[in-house]
């Protein structure tokens, strides 16, 4: 796909979007209508930070970890590479060694394992902890996945989360990659300026380089 246009790789946020079991359902409503106010519609948004396309801050899994405003926003803007890792139960150093990743700073993984934003998956391919030092050696500072988590859905240890941030690698989850080709792109996936938050929704977009 060659285009000069930005391509949206975010899950649209609407009242049908899937959320983590037990987490806050997404809701948008007009809480103050133009008829009531006399001039404007005012919307009310209720959601979990980890709904749809979002980033994780270390505070999400570490009480002493950095929060969103502590993160380097430069990481979320710049050249990125998309690669296909479909049909794998887990992804680690072994699976990525065959790819040429020298000079890559941001890496998005297409697993094509779950494409329904309105259904929460029962199982996902996850990242193994040994991926973190491998990515760090390559100079990669951000990893993105097209599933809700880098760890197994029922996992409590969150080894991949911990090891990735230990090695200076930021996490982007629930990107939508089924409609874009492998290759090099410019990425913008900026978090909101949420002072004390453990993560943030993002509008992730890419443009071919």
From Swiss-Prot:
It comes from the Bacteria. Binds 2 zinc ions per subunit. Zn(2+) 1 binds at residues 50, 54, 56, 173. One of its GO terms (molecular function) is arylformamidase activity. Its cofactor is Zn(2+). Substrate binds at residue 20. The active site is at 60 (proton donor/acceptor). The keyword Cytoplasm does not apply. The keyword Zinc applies. Zn(2+) 2 binds at residues 56, 161, 173. It catalyses: N-formyl-L-kynurenine + H2O = L-kynurenine + formate + H(+). Keywords: Hydrolase, Metal-binding, Tryptophan catabolism, Zinc. Its EC number is 3.5.1.9. Pathway: Amino-acid degradation; L-tryptophan degradation via kynurenine pathway; L-kynurenine from L-tryptophan: step 2/2. It holds the Pfam family Cyclase. One of its GO terms (biological process) is anthranilate metabolic process. Homodimer. Belongs to the Cyclase 1 superfamily. KynB family. Catalyzes the hydrolysis of N-formyl-L-kynurenine to L-kynurenine, the second step in the kynurenine pathway of tryptophan degradation. This is Kynurenine formamidase.
